[in-house]
């Protein structure tokens, strides 16, 4: 049904839709933020992150992870690990990402988790650094700066609210309302804060940890990358009619090309030096998933 609903969106008369999104945006952002050098090098060269991840995890030359070779089966493990494990997830994260439907067994999942974390030590360090910085702010009320992020406690005097904030490389901030420290269900001291429950739609308390905060930060930076692209598209005189996650949908004149838009998405961002971005897309007479 959702596929049919998408096709109801059509461009204005005489125009076409140009649809483009970022390729592997979260994998690119987290590697850039953490300084995971080998991942950044993959994105700067061939871009085969699933094959490269499998190569790192299983110590197999990447050239062997190709169709027709028995080692090609490792690509699936590299893919699901890349998609599922960037935010401190374990076996359950792999299962949620469909690992068992990909032919993997539950028994081999802990090994995949361990291999991925060993291959990505700087991303693993990022999780713990984020958690330690947030806890330090809560315990000392002093700002903490790590990885081009600034953690702080801020207050709204007018409304009597307090926030744990994280200033992103762009200068924008994430806000965690009414934060406090309390033991979580695992008996570990953790940050708790108020959020609107997805089911209840009411304010309720939730806890967080390094990996989850890293996810918030990475996805927020990815959003800021999208905002830069929206500005560039607007500066070209083109109209973005809507955007979905990291995807832009442009009501474009016939002469506009997909390559033109992808080039805008790949341009360097001043506040993110060294972040390598890439766009991919298509054009058509109605909206759809590529």
PLM regions: where:
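Conserved catalytic core of nucleotide polymerization and phosphodiester-bond processing enzymes
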Residues: 1-290
